[in-house]
């Protein structure tokens, strides 16, 4: 009972904190994406707001939604396990934190409303249309320098040659900058010689070495607060710098070059914007920066630029996305630890529209190991089933799906049910004529569960030829099943001794039968 004014005030403050913690604060760019796995955050036990969940492909099925809405006590999704990656506000520090949340409600009230908003958000992601960026680079290549203008740059070219062997970067930058200033002082206003054209010309013709490129990047930074007064000019210069970074492969990204380019980007932000400059960069330049940060292993910046492209309705190149996924795997060493999977989800949260509508085989292969619940796996498989390249994607990923199904539980009956679900999802893709190589993998997986009925059913239905080698594989799988599930389901239909005897006598040769005799 609340009896005092102090208790009432305390109760109101607590309610306010809880209400505040359920709001959505989209501050991904300012959020450390690698979470602190050593901290146990009790607030993650609360069901997050649908907008706080960053899972890019989980979609509860109609049956899951119905079950949640029809369960009076503790309705849940994903069995209420703490595996829903979420960005939430910490109730005390009010910092945005990355946690694995439980989708387990206290009671049935509000579940339907929560599901409607969650499903609506997923539908919005499915409806996002992305188009590749225009590859026209004409505006970057047209330099407004006449032969007369280029002749005026001879002094600048001579300075670049004279200081080539000078080790002092600062003095080299000052020498080039002084000569650049002399050109503008001598030049009449009628010729309209622009700083960005000169720098782009120099980068294109003299930026072939890492040292010269660093020099010209530093000169560009010095000119930011004098003659480079428009983002259009910076787009041109950045384009040529990043083209040279990509072309100069020995080495492509030395630490000094990385520092110089990042200092230039920071200076651009300070010069034109209070925060970040992505909104004013050309999509081609954003793609270049994305590739650059992927190469240098800067995942946070890679995520920022990738997310910005997607928000602008631009579909990044498949090769760039693949390199991004490879960089994530390298960073986490292809780990399947819970903490690492949670952090990996943060880095791919922006990919939801791509997963839904433009998924590639490499992307699907990356996502399968990240599933921690069978319902997640089904969501991903349903996305593949509806994709334009469904058959090719299933051909490449089905063996991985079958293997992954058996990792969620050790219960042979649940595993058998899950295997049957996967088989039923993919069968229509093949017109009910699933290739024998995949049917054989399903049979071996059912053998690992000791499910004689399903093995016999699939052998008969798909007329699988039981070669000597394949029979030995079945026997090894059945032996593993007997060791792993010795005390489970021995009396269940399809698993008991009578079915075992029937299967052995009908499907195995005499020489193979003895291997399974008690």
Swiss-Prot record:
One of its GO terms (molecular function) is translation regulator activity. The keyword Cytoplasm does not apply. Disulfide bonds: none annotated. One of its GO terms (cellular component) is mitochondrion. Residues 1-19 form a transit peptide. It is found in: Mitochondrion. Keywords: Mitochondrion, Transit peptide, Translation regulation. InterPro entries: Aep1. The keyword Membrane does not apply. Belongs to the AEP1 family. Required for translation of the mitochondrial OLI1 transcript encoding subunit 9 of mitochondrial ATP synthase. This is ATPase expression protein 1, mitochondrial.
């Amino acid at each position: 009972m609340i009896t005092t004014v102090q208790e009432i005030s305390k109760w109101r403050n607590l309610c306010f904190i809880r209400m505040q913690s359920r709001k959505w604060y989209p501050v991904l760019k300012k959020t450390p994406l690698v979470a602190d796995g050593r901290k146990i955050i009790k607030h993650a036990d609360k069901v997050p707001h649908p907008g706080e969940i960053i899972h890019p492909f989980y979609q509860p099925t109609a049956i899951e939604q119905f079950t949640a809405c029809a369960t009076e006590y503790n309705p849940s999704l994903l069995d209420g396990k703490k595996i829903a990656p979420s960005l939430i506000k910490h109730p005390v520090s009010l910092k945005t934190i990355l946690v694995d949340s439980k989708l387990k409600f206290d009671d049935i009230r509000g579940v339907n409303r929560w599901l409607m908003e969650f499903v609506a958000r997923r539908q919005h992601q499915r409806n996002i249309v992305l188009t590749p960026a225009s590859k026209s680079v004409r505006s970057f290549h047209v330099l407004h320098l006449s032969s007369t203008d280029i002749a005026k740059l001879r002094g600048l070219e001579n300075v670049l040659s004279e200081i080539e062997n000078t080790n002092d970067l600062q003095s080299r930058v000052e020498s080039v900058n002084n000569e650049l200033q002399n050109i503008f002082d001598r030049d009449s206003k009628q010729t309209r010689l622009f700083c960005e054209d000169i720098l782009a010309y120099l980068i294109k013709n003299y930026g072939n070495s890492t040292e010269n490129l660093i020099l010209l990047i530093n000169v560009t930074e010095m000119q930011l607060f004098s003659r480079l007064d428009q983002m259009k000019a910076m787009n041109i210069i950045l384009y040529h710098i990043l083209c040279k970074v990509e072309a100069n492969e020995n080495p492509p990204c030395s630490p000094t070059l990385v520092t110089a380019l990042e200092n230039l980007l920071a200076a651009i932000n300070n010069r034109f914007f209070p925060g970040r400059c992505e909104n004013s960069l050309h999509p081609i330049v954003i793609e270049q920066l994305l590739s650059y940060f992927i190469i240098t292993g800067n995942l946070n910046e890679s995520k920022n630029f990738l997310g910005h492209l997607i928000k602008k309705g631009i579909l990044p190149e498949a090769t760039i996305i693949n390199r991004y996924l490879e960089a994530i795997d390298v960073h986490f060493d292809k780990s399947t630890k819970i903490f690492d999977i949670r952090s990996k989800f943060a880095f791919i949260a922006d990919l939801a529209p791509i997963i839904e509508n433009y998924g590639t085989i490499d992307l699907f292969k990356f996502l399968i190991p990240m599933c921690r619940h069978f319902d997640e796996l089904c969501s991903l498989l349903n996305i593949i089933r509806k994709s334009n390249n469904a058959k090719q994607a299933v051909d490449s990923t089905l063996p991985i799906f079958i293997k992954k199904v058996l990792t969620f539980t050790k219960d042979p009956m649940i595993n058998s049910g899950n295997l049957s679900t996967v088989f039923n999802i993919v069968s229509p893709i093949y017109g009910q004529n699933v290739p024998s190589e995949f049917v054989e993998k399903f049979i071996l997986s059912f053998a690992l569960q000791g499910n004689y009925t399903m093995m016999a059913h699939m052998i008969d239905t798909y007329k699988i030829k039981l070669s000597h080698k394949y029979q030995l594989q079945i026997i090894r799988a059945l032996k593993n099943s007997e060791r792993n599930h010795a005390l489970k389901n021995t009396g269940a239909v399809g698993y008991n001794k009578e079915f075992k005897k029937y299967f052995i006598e009908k499907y195995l040769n005499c020489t193979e039968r003895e291997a399974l005799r008690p």
